[in-house]
Every structure is written in structure tokens, then in C-alpha cells.
Swiss-Prot record:
Protein name: Elongation factor G, mitochondrial
Enzyme class: hydrolase
Reaction(s) this enzyme catalyzes, per UniProt: GTP + H2O = GDP + phosphate + H(+)
UniProt GO MF annotations: GTP binding; GTPase activity; translation elongation factor activity
Length: 724
């Protein structure tokens, strides 16, 4: 049995990389590289996504090592205290979790793979959202023991939202109880995917030492230091029958959705290896099939084969249709398809998907969708037409930057000095003004009061809040005038705690966080018809506005937004006054009538009204809308909406009787309580699902607690005293 030693081209890749760039830190100037323009079919943009602790970052570390991007591997919670390359934040290394997405790229046998490693914790889900928005494919990492877990559902929804094709890598096959069949069952029955194994593990638990490649029909063993040598051999005798059965199952699942393979299957023709690979690629790109691979990143097994599958099965940028909205000469909007050609025949179009404060200023991450972007180019923001010059252009490798001169369609790059917001589209054509669809931003679910420990740190406190709220759209702040305190809102306790720790470590500003509170919303319980007249005469120019219509509660799937529509006929209310009405609505919904939480889930429909030629000014119409809403606070039926969370608790069977479901307000500090109830053996994860009305009893209790907190008397008690 002569081993066919196949090295993963590590030495060659390292030589190539060292010839074209050198990494630089904040203390040294970058060197410039001018790479050749790689063909579009040799580009892959992928994300590594998974439930927390499934091994995403370890998988990425192995990819970097086998591709020659790093010289040695380090673990997330390694004894050497170095930490994984992609977890470059100090807090990430301390906690052993990924907090923010990190970008890098590798060369794998002539294919450039741009990689974004994303967090697994639900509190940082916006990092996954903005990564998947700009990626063409993904690797979904599942734990061989846990299979499909709570956060897997969230990632699956995000993949579907952005129509991202993916392959599945079942990790941790060396652990006791690991099996790819559990993951396969979860993909099929929990996530409703057409999935099949393309790998069978060789050896169970700690004896796992290789895989059977069901497509190629041979065994692969990963040997040598760090698993660098991939040895090809015959399939072990005890696995040959199962391998044949699983291969047939694989072909059947593909044939169900692929016309070419389906015809061969019906005609009893056996497809060859090339035909199976091509069919897998066709169906993966169309999101009709999910191939399931196996391995153990920690034990250095299966990762090279997984990278090969990324190149074989996931789409290049030309195979993904990307669209933008532009305005025609008549002012109408139309959708255009962006060209993936890697040249400057068409104007540059790029999406700023992530902001990060660096030592050189704001770092803006871009996905180039069309044309090319070069250092020194002038680009225009589609939102407001402002003109910006690209002074520096870099590619990211975790915390390091490698300066480049030009980025082409399909590339992911970053630039400095671009004052913009996440989700903005830029173009080199001032007249094009394209708008790429932005990413989904989930609503915050908890709030905390926050203040600096020392008054002298007030300036740094404001700077930190301003920066963090700009970088992270799920981290929000507001100032409570009554309580005279700053309130921050986010996706969970960990989310807010991390920002508190970052204020201390990055701004030397220790802060105190108050008790968590639920981010309630206020909504109408039933439609409310209104006919409201605002009239004010003070000696000078008066104010006049009259509006008639209805406020409807929105359905459950849209109850986090406020909608406004003009349903008038004729010109009783001139069209140029509707922006003022909308402005008044946007301001008044910040505080509802129950506990001054934000109003959501309503649709204000203006059906008729009246105006005055002189007195119906912008401020008059703003006041008309706001006073109508204040009247509705008194007359309409209002409800509290609370966040409904999906909670997954993992605990030994003997402790299950002690673990019960709770309201979100009862889940604060639940980690400590669960550890106490389960002798430290229980774990739980929680993610936002939707907003729904509270019970009337809960609403009364929340209102009473809010009034007590703010020293406000119960209006019902006042009424009782008057009657006496």
C-alpha cells in the first residue's frame, strides 16, 4: 500500500505570498502590491457560519494554515495564549468567542477565496447579516454531536434571506457520540433541505482518522505534522457496503432536482465522477441541494477536502445575479443587473457593508459588484450624492492590512477616510446613483442605563457611544430626559456587556450598567378612526391643518415598523405637505402612551383633510399630526408588545424538572441561575423571534412598575379618590 502523498501546496503558496506582499501593523507603512487580474471563475466569496462553539474559527484557522497564509496554527482557547488569527480583538481572546466578523483571503491552487469568519452567538447576529449580504456562498459548520442547534435556525434563515448557496461541514467528528447522520437528519427534517452525505467518517469518536469520499470512491487519510499530507487509499472493507448505499442515496437526492442526472437515473445509466461533481455544483448554486462533508478541524482532518469542495461546488461572482435600483431620466426607479466583468467597461458600484474604527481613521469594508475601484478614484454616495476620494485601498487579513492599487468586481476590500453609514452604495458615475439592497437589521430586545464611573471620562464616553452606534446598527442609544440618564439597547446582555468592556479597554472609560429592561413596543389593539383639526391663532400668522383617516394595527410579521400612506383624492391636502405630516409622525412615535416605549406596528392612513393657503405651513402640519396622535393616546386602545425569544436549554436529564420557561424579563441573569440549578452542567442560548402582545395582567404589572420607578401616581387611584 504505497501512499500517494499529496501536499497541499503550502510551501508554494507561502513563497507566492511572500513575493507579493508583506503584512504590516500600525507601526509600519504598507508596501504596495500590483496583482494580476484573476479571472472571475477563480474567485470565491464565502462565509463560515454556525451555532456558537461549533468550531467555525478553528476551521478558518486550518484553512489559513493549509493555504500557507499563516506559518503555525493556534487554538481559540489555546494554552499558548496566542489565540486564533481571526479572533484578533483582546476581548475575543479572553472570552474564547468571536465578537465581530473578520475578513481574510487565501490562494487555493490558483483560486482566490475571500473569507469572512462570523460570530456564532446570537447577540452578534448583525455581523452575520452584513457578511451574508455580500457573500456568494457559505460553509455551514455543524457540530457532529449537537447537529442542528438553536442558532443554526437563525443562520439558516439568514442564508435563505440573501439566497446564499452553502455546503455543510460536520465538525468535531473525533468527539464521543459524533455522527454525520444526526446533522443530516437535522438538515432534512428541521431545516427542510435536500441534503445527502458526500463523506463517510472512518473510525468513531477518538478513533476517527479519515473519510470516505463517496463521489471519488476512495478513502482519504490526513497525516504528518498538522495533517498536511493527504493520503489516498482504498475504502476499508467494513465500510464498502455502506459507502455504496450512501453513494446511491447521494445520486438519488441529486437526481430529484437535477434534470441531467435525473434522466440518467431514470434510464438506469450510471453517472461518472465528473458528472456527479457537475450535478452537485449545479444544484448547490441553485440552492436545491446541500452536500454534507465530515472532518475534525481541531484534529486536522478533512479541512483540505472541504476547501476543495468550496472551489468545486460554490458559485463564483458571475454565477450570482446582483441587482441595483437606479432612477431613469423621467425619475422612475428601475432595477438593473450589475456586470461581474473584472474590468472598467462599466462604472464602479460597491456596497459599504461594515464600518470599523482603525488607527488610520474609519475603515470601510466594500464589496465591489461592478467595474473596478482604484486608489485615487472619486466616488459618489448614492444616498446624497456627496463626493469622496479614495485615498487608500487595502485587503484585510484579520487585523492586518495589505495595500493594493485596484479592486475589481467580485473583490472584497476596505478603504480609509470614507465618512459613510453601513449599507450605503457608492459609484464612480455621479449620474447613476445606484442603490443596492441593504441588509436586514433586527430590532434590539433589551435596554440598560449606562454611565461613566468617573465624571472626567464624559468626553470619552460620548466618543465611544458615537463610534459604536455608528459601527453596529443593533446597538442604539437614547437619552431619557425624565430620568436624566443614557439608555443603550442591544440584542442581549452579552452584547451590552461587551460594549461596556470595550469602553474601558479602548477608551479608558470604565462604565456602570444598570439593571436590564425589556425593549417593549406599544401598538394599537384595534383600528382607530380619526378626524382631527389643528387651529392656532396667536396674533401673527396662524396654524391650520385638518386630517381624516384611520390608524390600523399592522399584522404580526410587520409589527416592528410604522407605516404612513397618502390615500387622499383631489388636492384637499397638497402633496408637498405630506412630508411634514410624515415628519410629525416619525417624531411622535418615539414615546407611546403606556410606558413611553417606542410605538410600532401601526399604519397611519390619511384619507381626507383640509388646509389653508397661508396658515398650513410645514410646522402647522407637523403639529397637526402630533396632536392627532396625542388624541389617539387618550381615545384609542393601546397594547404593549414584548419580544418573544427562542430559548434552547441543554441539561442532563436529572435536572430537567428544575428548568422551566420564563418571560424575557425573568431571563436576565439566567446563566447563573441555570448553573446553580444544574450543578454547572446546563447551558442555554436565546435568540429573538418576534414581537407579540403581552397579556393584560402583564401589561398592568409592567405599567405599575414603570409608574413606580418614575414616581407617577396611578390614574385609577386618582379616580377612586375623586369618587370618594
Amino acid at each position: 500500500m504505497s501512499p500517494l502523498g499529496r501536499f497541499s501546496a503550502v510551501a508554494q503558496s507561502r513563497r507566492q505570498l511572500n513575493n507579493v506582499f508583506r503584512r504590516f501593523t500600525s507601526n509600519e507603512a504598507p508596501s504596495v502590491i500590483v496583482p494580476g487580474v484573476r479571472p472571475i471563475e477563480r474567485i470565491r466569496n464565502i462565509g463560515i457560519s454556525a451555532h456558537i462553539d461549533s468550531g467555525k474559527t478553528t476551521v478558518t484557522e486550518r484553512i489559513l494554515y493549509y493555504a500557507g497564509r499563516i506559518d503555525s496554527m493556534h487554538e481559540v482557547r489555546g494554552k499558548d495564549d496566542v489565540g486564533a488569527t481571526m479572533d484578533f480583538m483582546e476581548l475575543e481572546r479572553q472570552r474564547g468567542i468571536t465578537i465581530q466578523s473578520a475578513a481574510t483571503y487565501v490562494d487555493w491552487h490558483g483560486t482566490n477565496i475571500n473569507i469572512i469568519d462570523t460570530p456564532g452567538h446570537v447577540d452578534f447576529t448583525v455581523e452575520v447579516e452584513r457578511a451574508l449580504r455580500v457573500l456568494d456562498g457559505a460553509v455551514l459548520v455543524l457540530c457532529g454531536v449537537g447537529g442542528v442547534q438553536s442558532q443554526t435556525f437563525t443562520v439558516n434563515r439568514q442564508l435563505a434571506r440573501y439566497n446564499v448557496p452553502f455546503i455543510c461541514f460536520v465538525n468535531k467528528m473525533d468527539r464521543n457520540g459524533a455522527s454525520p447522520l444526526k446533522a443530516l437528519d437535522g438538515l432534512r427534517n428541521k431545516l427542510n433541505h435536500n441534503a445527502a452525505l458526500v463523506h463517510l467518517p472512518i473510525g468513531k469518536d477518538s478513533n476517527f482518522n479519515g473519510i470516505v469520499d463517496l463521489v471519488e470512491g476512495h478513502a482519504l487519510y490526513y497525516e504528518g505534522e498538522g495533517g498536511l499530507i493527504v493520503r489516498k487509499d482504498e475504502i476499508p472493507k467494513d465500510l464498502r457496503v455502506e459507502a455504496e448505499d450512501r453513494r446511491q442515496e447521494l445520486i438519488e437526492h441529486i437526481a430529484n432536482v437535477d434534470e441531467t442526472l435525473g434522466e440518467m437515473f431514470l434510464n438506469d445509466q450510471k453517472p461518472d465522477v465528473k458528472q456527479i461533481h457537475e450535478a452537485i455544483r449545479r444544484t448547490v448554486v441553485k440552492r436545491q441541494f446541500v452536500p454534507v462533508l465530515s472532518g475534525s478541524a481541531l484534529k486536522n482532518k478533512g479541512v483540505q477536502t472541504m476547501i476543495d469542495s468550496v472551489v468545486k461546488y460554490l458559485p463564483d461572482p458571475s454565477e450570482v445575479v446582483n441587482r441595483a435600483t437606479v432612477k431613469t431620466e423621467t425619475g422612475e426607479e428601475k432595477r438593473i443587473i450589475l456586470s461581474p466583468e473584472r474590468n472598467n467597461d462599466k462604472p464602479f458600484v460597491g456596497l459599504a457593508f461594515k464600518l470599523e474604527a482603525g488607527k488610520y481613521g474609519q475603515l470601510t469594508y466594500f464589496r465591489v459588484y461592478q467595474g473596478q475601484l482604484s486608489k485615487g478614484d472619486t466616488v459618489y454616495a448614492s444616498r446624497d450624492g456627496r463626493k469622496v476620494r479614495v485615498q487608500r485601498l487595502v485587503r484585510m487579513h484579520a487585523a492586518d492590512m495589505e495595500e493594493i492599487t485596484t479592486a475589481y468586481a467580485g473583490d472584497i476590500c476596505a478603504t480609509f477616510g470614507l465618512d459613510c453609514h453601513s449599507g450605503e452604495t457608492f459609484s464612480t458615475d455621479q449620474n447613476l446613483a445606484p442603490h443596492c439592497e441593504s441588509m436586514h437589521i433586527p430590532e434590539p430586545v433589551i435596554s440598560m442605563a449606562i454611565k461613566p464611573v468617573n465624571r472626567k471620562d464624559a468626553d470619552n464616553f460620548i466618543k465611544a457611544l458615537t463610534r459604536f452606534t455608528k459601527e453596529d446598527p443593533t446597538f442604539r442609544r437614547e437619552y431619557n430626559q425624565e430620568a436624566k440618564e443614557t439608555i443603550v439597547s442591544g440584542m442581549g446582555e452579552l452584547h451590552l456587556e461587551i460594549y461596556a468592556q470595550r469602553m474601558k479597554s479602548e477608551y479608558n472609560c470604565p462604565v456602570e450598567l444598570g439593571k436590564p429592561s425589556v425593549a417593549y413596543r406599544e401598538c394599537l389593539g384595534a383600528p382607530y378612526k380619526f378626524h382631527f383639526r389643528h387651529k392656532k391663532q396667536t396674533g401673527g400668522q396662524g396654524q391650520f391643518g385638518e386630517i381624516e383617516g384611520v390608524i390600523d394595527p399592522l399584522p404580526a410579521d410587520r409589527n416592528t415598523v410604522v407605516e404612513f400612506s397618502d390615500e387622499t383624492f383631489g388636492n384637499n391636502i397638497p402633496k408637498n405637505l405630506f412630508p411634514a405630516l410624515k415628519k410629525g409622525l416619525d417624531a411622535i412615535v418615539a414615546e407611546g402612551p403606556l410606558i413611553k416605549s417606542r410605538i410600532a406596528g401601526i399604519h397611519v392612513r390619511i384619507q381626507d383633510g383640509a388646509t389653508h393657503a397661508v396658515d398650513s405651513t410645514e410646522i402647522a402640519m407637523i403639529n397637526t399630526m402630533q396632536n392627532m396622535m396625542r388624541e389617539s393616546f387618550e381615545k384609542a386602545s393601546w397594547l404593549l408588545l414584548e419580544p418573544i425569544m427562542k430559548v434552547e436549554v441543554t441539561t442532563p436529564a436529572e435536572f430537567q424538572g428544575n428548568v422551566v420557561t420564563s418571560a424575557l424579563s425573568d431571563m436576565f441573569g439566567y446563566t447563573s441561575e441555570l448553573r446553580s440549578l444544574t450543578e454547572g452542567k446546563g447551558e442555554f442560548s436565546m435568540e429573538y423571534s418576534r414581537y407579540a402582545p403581552t397579556s393584560l395582567e402583564a401589561q398592568d404589572r409592567v405599567q405599575a412598575e414603570w409608574r413606580q420607578l418614575h414616581g407617577i401616581a396611578d390614574p385609577n387611584e386618582k379616580g377612586k379618590k375623586k369618587k370618594k
